[in-house]
UniProtKB/Swiss-Prot annotation:
Name used for this protein in its record: Homeobox protein MSX-1
Entries under SMART domains matching the protein: HOX
PROSITE patterns: HOMEOBOX_1 (PS00027), HOMEOBOX_2 (PS50071)
Organism: Lemur catta (Ring-tailed lemur)
Record function comment: Acts as a transcriptional repressor. Capable of transcription autoinactivation. Binds to the consensus sequence 5'-C/GTAAT-3' in downstream activin regulatory elements (DARE) in the gene promoter, thereby repressing the transcription of CGA/alpha-GSU and GNRHR. Represses transcription of myoblast differentiation factors. Binds to core enhancer regions in target gene promoters of myoblast differentiation factors with binding specificity facilitated by interaction with PIAS1.
Phylogenetic lineage: Eukaryota, Metazoa, Chordata, Craniata, Vertebrata
Length: 297
């Protein structure tokens, strides 16, 4: 129990005193024992070869010195992974994202492609070169993915006016018949039964044909007459100018306008007097009378 504190005291005293005599032998023995224990601990630790560390100075210098060293290391690591070896370089974890000098094995090209996701053959995704035989994959032929075919709407049939079944065809009049009918119409627009029968027989026409022609000709003459009357009315009607071009005067005529203008100019004799303005009588004509150059008939 007394030797441990003595040893501690001896070490404390050994640092403060020069080595010598019997007191200096105890510190030297303790130092030798500590050195031996440190050497044993270092021997117990596994020695790591510098070449195994990927980021060590020796590994970096070796990569610069030997260009083919990196390729050989990559080939060796790929061979170890292919053989199922579990040996991995230090400092690189199996699930780490940044693995130096050990790129992940390339996946097949079609792993994330449409064919890989839909589990379809690659031939079905390639467009056929010949447009004559278009090939469609099963999922495109499914009604779920492909739209329904567009319906071709037939153009609506043109509806024509239906004529009567017992309608007689239009009579083609000759030029001589038309001239004779026009001459007879100018002489007399209405024919009696006897005149119509005689005139139709002279033209080799039926009485009904002559009757219908005279009816149509009277309707045409009426339309022409109405159009002519409308033209005459438009020509005889005077063109009234708009209100902006008409001269507008108040009640009293131009003389009242001149008097009002003179009163407004010369009525203000004093500095505080306001110009006198003409005031129209209340209750009488409040609208101005417009004098126009045109006279209505």
């Amino acid at each position: 129990m007394t030797s441990l504190p003595l040893g501690v005291k001896v070490e404390d005293s050994a640092f403060g005193k020069p080595a010598g005599g019997g007191a200096g032998q105890a510190p030297s023995a303790a130092a030798a024992t500590a050195a031996t224990m440190g050497a044993d601990e270092e021997g117990a630790k596994p020695k790591v070869s510098p070449s195994l560390l990927p980021f060590s100075v020796e590994a970096l210098m070796a990569d610069h010195r030997k260009p083919g060293a990196k390729e050989s290391a990559l080939a060796a690591s790929e061979g170890a992974q292919a053989a199922g070896g579990s040996a991995q370089p230090l400092g690189v974890r199996p699930g780490s994202l940044c693995a130096p000098d050990a790129p992940s094995s390339p996946r097949p090209l079609g792993h994330f492609s449409v064919g890989g996701l839909l589990k379809l053959p690659e031939d079905g995704l390639i467009k056929a070169e010949s447009p004559e035989k278009p090939e469609r994959t099963p999922w495109m032929q499914s009604p779920r993915f492909s739209p329904p075919p567009a319906r071709r709407l037939s153009p609506p049939a043109c509806t024509l006016r239906k004529h009567k079944t017992n309608r007689k065809p239009r009579t083609p009049f000759t030029t001589a018949q038309l001239l004779a009918l026009e001459r007879k119409f100018r002489q007399k627009q209405y024919l009696s039964i006897a005149e119509r029968a005689e005139f139709s027989s002279s033209l080799s026409l039926t009485e009904t044909q002559v009757k219908i022609w005279f009816q149509n000709r009277r309707a045409k003459a009426k339309r022409l007459q109405e159009a002519e009357l409308e033209k005459l009315k438009m020509a005889a009607k005077p063109m009234l100018p708009p209100a902006a071009f008409g001269l507008s005067f108040p009640l009293g005529g131009p003389a009242a306008v001149a008097a009002a203008a003179g009163a407004s100019l010369y009525g203000a004799s004093g500095p505080f007097q306001r110009a006198a303005l003409p005031v129209a009588p209340v209750g009488l004509y409040t609208a101005h009378v417009g004098y126009s150059m045109y006279h209505l008939t």
